[in-house]
Curated annotation (Swiss-Prot):
Domain of life of the source: Eukaryota
Predominant location: cytoplasm
Coiled coil residues, start to end: none
Protein name: F-actin-capping protein subunit beta
InterPro entries documented for this protein: CapZ_alpha/beta, CapZ_alpha/beta_2, CAPZB, CAPZB_N, F-actin_capping_bsu_CS
Originating organism: Dictyostelium discoideum (Social amoeba)
Gene name tied to this protein: acpA
Subunit: Component of the F-actin capping complex, composed of a heterodimer of an alpha and a beta subunit.
PANTHER family documented for this protein: F-ACTIN-CAPPING PROTEIN SUBUNIT BETA, F-ACTIN-CAPPING PROTEIN SUBUNIT BETA ISOFORMS 1 AND 2
Subcellular location: Cytoplasm, Cytoskeleton
GO cellular component, one term: cytosol
Any Gene Ontology biological process: barbed-end actin filament capping
GO molecular function: actin filament binding; lipid binding
């Protein structure tokens, strides 16, 4: 019964507005509290931003940097609020984490012209995993354009170390995109959705540097594919549907033409 309930919950969440995912998820957790852990681990939520007072930098929150009610900053490697006996990556993995955070901060500035990024690593049995988080929020209303948008991307990479300096990188990527406009001509329009894709590749590696390069290459390629898919399929299809539904001529103009046609018909009938 539990598996069926979980399947129904996930199916329901896929059909509800992505912009209300947090409220809808909270409602589900109230209805089926026994599935709390499964639902929280299965449903991606918009990323939240926190501030690291030690490094004076923003970082992103997720389940992968949470221990109890505290979150670890990738910049200072400290938990907020402080937590005794908390989990930390091994020193070797921490080196990878530090370098990856520096790399993806540069990546975010180049591709998104700013935003917040965080990379977290954790140890597995003879292997390791990492998550790359990126968030970009744009508010054009401050510039006089009634448009706001948010891009959240979550890339989870599991690295299986093999023999002869070979490693298999399994990537699961999710992008959540939200765009909202509000003006007199169109009214309030909200487009939101999410997309998940997977990829797996084998690369050679050489300690810290190569792992960061390999993960960075996969994330960059995946984000490019996801952006293209969102633009050509999802937004392209939305535009096609809107163009099919809307009238090229306004309703008031159509009403005027209809009245004129009726008047002409009446006039012709009277002449006959």
């Amino acid at each position: 019964m539990t598996e069926k309930q979980l399947s129904c919950c996930l199916d329901l969440m896929r059909r509800l507005p992505p912009s209300q995912i947090e409220d809808n998820l909270a409602g589900l957790l109230d209805l089926v509290p026994d599935l709390t852990e499964d639902l929280l681990s299965s449903i991606d939520q918009p990323l939240k931003v926190a501030y690291d007072a030690v490094s004076k930098k923003d970082y992103l929150l997720c389940d992968y940097n949470r221990d109890a009610d505290s979150y670890r900053s990738p910049w200072s490697n400290k938990y907020d609020p402080p937590l005794s006996g908390a989990c930390y990556p091994s020193s070797k993995l921490r080196d990878i984490e530090v370098q990856a955070n520096e790399i993806f901060e540069i990546y975010l500035n180049l591709y998104f012209e700013g935003g917040v990024s965080s990379v977290y690593c954790w140890d597995l049995d003879d292997n390791f995993a990492a998550v790359v988080l990126m968030k970009k929020t744009q508010d054009q209303s401050k510039k006089g354009q009634p448009m706001r948008g948010t891009w959240d991307s979550i890339h989870v990479v599991e690295v299986k170390l093999g023999k002869k300096d070979k490693a298999v990188y399994k990537l699961t990527s999710t992008v959540m995109l939200s765009i909202e406009t509000d003006n007199d001509n169109t009214g309030k329009v909200n487009l939101a959705g999410s997309l998940t894709r997977q990829d797996e590749k084998e690369y050679t590696f050489n300690e810290v540097d190569t792992h960061c390069v390999n993960i960075g290459k996969m994330v960059e390629d995946m984000e490019s594919k996801l952006r293209q898919t969102l633009e050509t399929i999802y937004f392209g299809k939305t535009k096609e549907v809107v163009n099919t539904l809307r009238n090229a001529t306004g309703n008031s103009e159509l009403e005027k033409r209809k009245n004129l046609s009726n008047q002409i018909g009446s006039a012709i009938g009277n002449r006959g």
